[in-house]
Amino acid sequence: RITQIYEGTNGIQALDLVGRKVVGTGGELYKLFADEIRHFTATACADLAEFTRPLNIALDNLDELTAWLLDRSKNNPNEIGAASVEYLHAFGYTAYAYMWALMAKASVSREAQDDFYASKLGTARFYFARLLPRVQSLAASVKAGSDSLYLLDADQF
């Protein structure tokens, strides 16, 4: 996440994600991403439920945000810019959750034999408990829409 600061282009990347890759494809590229995660969670063993359940919830949240953006941006292109950074972050938190779930899958059967794998599971549990829930507040920001961004006239700044 530190590369966001170093690059200084987070807003541009967010606009590219939402404008070109999500809205610009009618959600088709997003669907590929979501389908990969759904396949993983549907085929994961029961030992991974502590990760797959919240991952599915986060993905459902992202599905809802994506549908909301696709619908709202048809009539108001300002929604793309207004939602892009928060959407990028929600997308990123969900993608990281998927990566942590994959690492948990590789670690769950080895936790007792190796501290490395135990630490991977501990970190995954931390991520799911402390960081992934942030997608809820990001969703609220996205759904606040663009109206409040345009309440002030330029001379009021």
Located regions from the model:
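Catalytic phosphate/nucleotide-handling subdomain of diverse soluble enzymes
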Residues: 1-14, 18-30
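C-terminal amphipathic alpha-helical interaction region
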Residues: 21-24, 34-157
